[in-house]
Amino acid sequence: MAQLDTLDVVVLAVLLAGSIAYFTKGTFWAVAKDPYASSGPAMNGVAKAGKSRNIIEKMDETGKNCVIFYGSQTGTAEDYASRLAKEGSQRFGLKTMVADIEEYDYENLDQFPEDKVAFFVLATYGEGEPTDNAVEFYQFITGDDVSFEGGGSAEDKPLSSLKYVAFGLGNNTYEHYNAMVRQVDAALTKLGAQRIGSAGEGDDGAGTMEEDFLAWKEPMWAALSEAMNLQEREASYEPVFCVTEDESLTPEDNSVYLGEPTKGHLEGQPNGPYSAHNPYIAPIVESRELFTVKDRNCLHMEISIAGTNLTYQTGDHIAIWPTNAGAEVDRFLNVFGLEEKRHSVINIKGIDVTAKVPIPTPTTYDAAVRYYMEVCAPVSRQFVSTLAAFAPDEETKTEIVRLGSDKDYFHEKITNQCFNIAQALQSITSKPFSNVPFSLLIEGLNKIQPRYYSISSSSLVQKDKISITAVVESTRLPGATHIVKGVTTNYLLALKQKQNGDPSPDPHGQTYAINGPRNKYDGIHVPVHVRHSNFKLPSDPSRPIIMIGPGTGVAPFRGFIQERAALAARGEKVGPTVLFFGCRKRDEDFLYKDEWKVFQDQLGDSLKIITAFSRESEKKVYVQHRLKEHAELVSDLLKQKATFYVCGDAANMAREVNLVLGQIIAAQRGLPAEKGEEMVKHMRSSGSYQEDVWS
């Protein structure tokens, strides 16, 4: 029983500190505003109606009766918000506007008019956390001391005039599934707001996000129509953007965006701060393959941030801004009949005063597709159905209508193949969809998003260089007729090939515009920014750590061990450092095999590396099996206040590790299984169990 008391004390002692760290996440590094979100004449072609952070004033000025707030990390929630706004306007006559939730104040929500409605489309990021742009709203609305302009307390139901709709985007492989929408919904209800319809939840972990969204919104619209006395009408396409070809400009004009991410980059004067909306064009100073087996490649790259204001801490993430593969750009332009005018200059303007143009303008069709639009993503059923009206013939139209209305048929023909929009349409007909307005494509496809990778170096050891470790994705799905190629990792492989002497890089049949717009990436450069993380080493290096990192999940732990080796070289006391690493075979994909030997020499007995090779015997062995085999070691380190880290696959490995750890605690302490699970939950909430996982 004394052992249990010790662990309880450990858990409780760090609970407060961990909670503070959790709830202040993101407030110490502000997210820069998107330079394309503000629309002066060069962006939307119209002046914005004021710069007020007062959403009620904004709605009054622009004649809106429906605002759709979004909290988005990767762009999906923003896309859903835009789709809801468009559908609400076209089907029900709502005067809608889409709003980034961080761009408005919340203290006056108690003044929200009863004849208007607010939507909250909120993604949950990581382990139940708000997205970067929703941190302040989350802290405000769920705070114990929340107060509004009209005064009063929560007991006074200050939001009684607020009608709202809620949809959350989550992943069931994480413990705190859809925590953001659930907690915000509970807070709004507690404050007296009236939810219309049920709070929807989409599950990316189950692969049903899109269908969850579609299934939720129809009964939601019915409930909203009744609550606001809306009349449904036949929807027809009404463009959000006006796209015009500008014959007075050519791609050679220095005012035309050819892939530059910001105006500063266009003008050749990029300046910091570098952020999610303003990348640094960083030189790649080293690139190599850690292994190459059949169609599997794993890259190690060193990216220089010397001479910039970019900084990172061990455990942070680096974002790579990708470029679409040339073959997919060509496919897209051909499918939509744009090949012959790919280099024509276009201007894009928002028809509505509140509409944000997602890509810079003026630009060209080619640049828009290559650098700004997510043309390689799996296509949604709803978007495919919108193209029926523009089908090249009746037979094609009939097929698209069927795909749009029959989710099982769509799943069989499109989802199972992991088709992007151009591939999906090519599977239906060889005829081009020349009548599809380019504005519809801008509206229906997300803006291309940066991809995040765990940094695999220590900022203490190399503050001016960031290491990344990435497996190049090239996968043939069961039943699929083509190989699905990762956009960013194949781009990185092409850069590696070019840097290492290949004059015509062609990774897995993909070609890329490696030199970038106007050759601004020449010399092997890539656009990047840094995202800070709470996945951190203990401040006291003598504290033990246990790391679980199979495959490229070992990336941050290379940085952790690199840092501890440097601290030991300085004469600091370094505690037990245990790594559980797994891969297929020791002579095939054992990442950083030689480096571990060097670190072992530097750290001596304090470093212990335990391996699991899944394909060296008939019975597959994974890291969770090794964890169980070393239960006594794990239990002893936990008693010494060890921090437990997991990095890698969320759907299988991370879940299994979580389960096994609970079993270890229970078995080693003679406790019921439920108590072991409870202790793991306490470790999570206190910050002594940390995850950097993906699905």
Curated annotation (Swiss-Prot):
GO BP annotations of the record are: ergosterol biosynthetic process
* Membrane side Cytoplasmic: residue ranges: 32-695
Domain Flavodoxin-like positions: 66-221
Residues that bind NADP(+): R296, T552, S614, R615, K620, V621, Y622, V623, Q624, E656
Per the UniProt entry, the Enzyme Commission number(s) are 1.6.2.4
Q: Does the keyword Mitochondrion apply?
A: yes
Q: Which UniProt keywords apply?
A: Cell membrane, Endoplasmic reticulum, FAD, Flavoprotein, FMN, Lipid biosynthesis, Lipid metabolism, Membrane, Mitochondrion, Mitochondrion outer membrane, NADP, Oxidoreductase, Steroid biosynthesis, Steroid metabolism, Sterol biosynthesis, Sterol metabolism, Transmembrane, Transmembrane helix
Q: Which InterPro entries match?
A: CysJ-like_FAD-binding (IPR003097), FAD-bd_FR_type (IPR017927), Flavdoxin-like (IPR001094), Flavodoxin/NO_synth (IPR008254), Flavoprot_Pyr_Nucl_cyt_Rdtase (IPR001709), Flavoprotein-like_sf (IPR029039), FNR_nucleotide-bd (IPR039261), NADPH_Cyt_P450_Rdtase_alpha (IPR023173)
The molecular function terms in GO held by this entry are: flavin adenine dinucleotide binding; FMN binding; NADP binding; NADPH-hemoprotein reductase activity
Q: Name one GO cellular component term.
A: cytosol
Where in or outside the cell? Endoplasmic reticulum membrane; Mitochondrion outer membrane; Cell membrane
Q: Which cofactor does it need?
A: FAD; FMN
The FAD-binding FR-type domain, residue ranges: 277-538
Query: What general EC class does the enzyme of this chain belong to?
Result: oxidoreductase
Chain residue ranges for the region called Disordered: 497-516
Segments passing through the bilayer: 9-31
Report residues binding FAD.
Answer: R451, Y452, Y453, S454, T469, A470, V471, G486, V487, T488, T489, W694
Catalysed reaction per UniProt? Answer: 2 oxidized [cytochrome P450] + NADPH = 2 reduced [cytochrome P450] + NADP(+) + H(+)
Database matches in Pfam families:
FAD_binding_1 (PF00667), Flavodoxin_1 (PF00258), NAD_binding_1 (PF00175)
Q: What is the role of the protein in this entry? A: This enzyme is required for electron transfer from NADP to cytochrome P450 in microsomes. It can also provide electron transfer to heme oxygenase and cytochrome B5. Involved in ergosterol biosynthesis.
Q: Indicate the family of this protein.
A: Belongs to the NADPH--cytochrome P450 reductase family. In the N-terminal section; belongs to the flavodoxin family.
Name the UniProt record assigns to this protein: NADPH--cytochrome P450 reductase
Organism source for this protein? Emericella nidulans (strain FGSC A4 / ATCC 38163 / CBS 112.46 / NRRL 194 / M139) (Aspergillus nidulans)
The gene behind this protein is cprA
